[in-house]
Amino acid sequence: MLQIIDNTLMALKEPMPSKEELQSFCELLFTIGVDVIELPTIMYRHIEQLPQGRYILNVEYEEEINANPGFYRYVCHQPSCAKNIIHELQLNDIREIIKLRSFENCTELRIKGLDDLICHPYERYMGEWQSHLPDTTINFCPENTFGCATALAFQWGVDYGGNITASFAGCINNAATEELIMALRLAIRHKPNRDLTVLPRLTALYEKFFSMSIPNRKPIIGKNIFKVEAGVHVDGIHKNPATYEAYTPTCVGAKAELVIGKHSGTRAVKWKLEELKLPVTTDYVIDQILHQVRLICTKNRKSLCDEEFILLATEVMRCEGSQIYC
């Protein structure tokens, strides 16, 4: 059965976030559709009380398991035949797949790495894993050197229903949890009723934990992914959002926004004036507004925020003899 394991907490370093923040982060991961959360021993000792759910403890040696009982699974870097232990095997490239033959007796095996698998007949190789290790539960954790980790993880999940290890925003150089969840949701309706509107809260905690900002164009969680500027796109979304949007912005706690910039056209300017409740004036004045928009945006190399557009439109209409009544 397909399971998504999130190992974001494995990347956290000192100083640790508060217990309450970590607990909230775990709860939100479960909310969006993560099945199991992996964490290191030091994190477990810090957080003390784990929220309800299934957890994997990452240990160096099998002896540490006795000191930390009660977990759903344990990840260990030493080979083990125990049913509750996942052995982790690093394969740096496709040539090392031959090593899998040595793990026929493993109950569960995590295959980590294989960055270059996307450059080869990956479907054939994935099928060979299953045939060579018929009694082993395989957990795939592709790394992201070639920018294709999420695609490989998705393919493994869809074709073989296998377990996948990912991290939020792909922070451990592996598949991005949120991208994987959305892709599976759209392709095979995997957990379609999970609540993804909490993603902005999850993103805010992530940014605080790692003292970094998510790129504005990051798929699923970027702040600007639903900002549309180009005229053709604006027209299409205005008529039928499904033309350009695989899912609604509200599905992930966001909203669509029309941005005025150098790629905008007269229709976009008209719709923006209506949206901001400014008078939609003559075509000539709209052309003048658009001309000024393109000059300013080209010079500043960025689109206009609403406040900047209001000032510009007001000034153009004033110069053309129009008047805005508040």
Indicate residue ranges for each PLM-predicted region.
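Terminal or standalone catalytic/regulatory effector modules within metabolic enzymes
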Residues: 28-54, 58-62, 249-326
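Conserved active-site and cofactor/substrate-binding residues in soluble primary-metabolism enzymes
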Residues: 17-24, 120-124, 148-151, 175, ...
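Gly-rich Lys/Arg/Thr-decorated short loops/hinges at beta-loop-alpha junctions or inter-strand turns
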Residues: 4-8, 104-111, 252
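Catalytic alpha/beta core domains of metabolic enzymes, predominantly
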Residues: 114-243
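Active-site beta->alpha loop and helix N-cap motifs at the rims of alpha/beta catalytic domains
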Residues: 30-120
